[in-house]
Every structure is written in structure tokens, then in C-alpha cells.
Amino acid sequence: MIRIIKFYDECREFASSFQGDPNFSDPMLSDEEQVNCNLINAIDRTDRYVLGVYQDAAMIGLFTFLVLRDEQYIEMLVGLSRDKEAYLEVLRYLEQCYPGYSADFVFNPGNYLLKEFLDLRNAEYEPEQQKMVLGTPVLGIDTTGVELFSEQYTEQYCTLHNKDMYWTGEKVVQAKDRFRTFLAIHDNKVIGYMDVTYTFKENEPFDLFVLEEYRRKGYGRKLLAKALEMNQPNGMMLLVDADNDPAIRLYESMGFTKVQGQNNLTAHWSVPEN
């Protein structure tokens, strides 16, 4: 049985029992800010649903979903269970309530139960992500050629931007209350960009890109350096492909360190039409 959670006390003990679990802990609940955003405060949000899955009177699963009806989009913000029946029931719930929606799942790579059911539904996966957090930032790096986004570059930026993601260039431009965007400019041409949040105690780059012909010329380092400079005194975390050694070395050289046990995996699933 699935029931909407109305008070945090209904699920507090259940959620706490997953802390430190190597397979079933949730990378979206890795700190107090994420717990507040993705679980506690989500209970009162109209665009988020916190669902408890019960067997008899016992909770066997806890899930939070962001639901954007106008865009027919769902994102799992929390997924906690050690019981295959909970995953099966919540996926059936999505199939019943949100046919035709696009659904994203961000979860622990060790969660073989959820992955098994997503595999059966032909979900597509992004590469496993390594979490890194900022220790002492390396500041004072030359950032010539990098500047904050301005409207004169809107068309170039949106054309260059990765289209295969939720936060496209157009959406980032409209979300000035959430993102700062830094642009790498060469001869008045946008050759790279970095989108990064700025309203949190621990902010996060969402996308970093430099045109192929301008790579290995220091633009990626300059973009990151400018973002770190303007992020002071806040912290920063990021996710990088776990096998992308050059990018990991870049981030380590700028003051980031790997966080063990908090990698994540993202799956994309198209909920079938009825």
C-alpha cells in the first residue's frame, strides 16, 4: 500500500536507518541541507510527493518525487528501501498515475534492487558519477577571457549548450534565482560555459563545457577558478564521470577531494502510455 507522508515524524526513523548503508543509502540525502530540501521540506511542497510504501502496518519504502505536470517530467529525489516489493509497487504507481512522462532516477550504484526493475523497463543510464567536495579552494588563478553571463550572449550560449539534459540553456537563463553562468569568450565568441548554483551553503556546478578546438588551453580551469572566486565563502561539491581521470585531476588541482561511498547513478525511463 502507498500512502502520502504528511509529517516527517512518520518516516524519520525509517529514513535514518539507511545512513551509511553501502548499497541502499541515498546520495540525495548525504547532508543536512539535502535532507531538508529533498525530504522534510518536500512534504509541504505542491510539486513534490513524499510516499510511504507499507506492508501491513510496517513501512518498507520511502520515496520523494518531483512532478512537473506541464513538462510531463518526474525526478526521484529520495528512494529508500531494502525490499523489492516496495520498488515494484512504486514503479507501478508511476505507471498508473503518470503515463507518458519522462522519469529520472538518481540513486546509489549499489542499489541492485532498483536497478533490476529499471533494467526490466529498458531504462537508459548515464555513467556512474564520482562525488567530490571542495576543501581549501585554489584562488588567484588568472581568469582572463571568462566573464559572467550577459544577455548579449544569450543566443550563442543557448546554441552551444548541451541539449540532452533537463537544465538546458534556455531554462538556466530563466532561473537567475538559482544559477550563475560563466562564459569563456574568445574574439567575442562564446567558446565555453559553466552553470553553477549560488544560493546554497554547498553549491554545485551543473554543466561545464568547452568547444573541442579550445580544449587543453586552460579555459576549463579558468571557468572553475572564476566560479570558486565568486562562490566564497560557501562550499561546493560536484559530480564527475567516475572514469574521467583528466577531469578528476583538474578538480583535485583546484582543491576538491573524492568522497568515498557517495557516488550516484542516473537512469532515464519513459513511463509507458496506458
Predicted regions mapped to residue ranges:
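Conserved donor-binding loop and adjoining core beta-sheet/short helix segment
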Residues: E33-V90, M194-F206, E212
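Conserved hydrophobic beta-strand within the GNAT/NAT acetyltransferase core sheet
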Residues: A103-F107, P205, M236-V240
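Acyl-donor-binding surface of acyltransferase catalytic domains
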Residues: D70, V78-D142, L265-A267
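Short amphipathic alpha-helix that is part of the acyltransferase structural core
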Residues: M1-Q34, Q129, V138-W167
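Conserved acetyl-CoA-binding loop-helix of GNAT-fold acetyltransferases
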Residues: R82-Q96, V210, R216-M230, I248-S253
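Conserved active-site alpha-helix within GNAT-family acetyltransferase domains
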Residues: P109-P127, R221, D243-G261
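Flexible, substrate/cofactor-facing loop regions flanked by secondary structure
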Residues: D31-V35, D142-F206
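Short hydrophobic/aromatic beta-strand element in the GNAT-like acyltransferase core
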Residues: R48-G52, L62, K115, Q129, ...
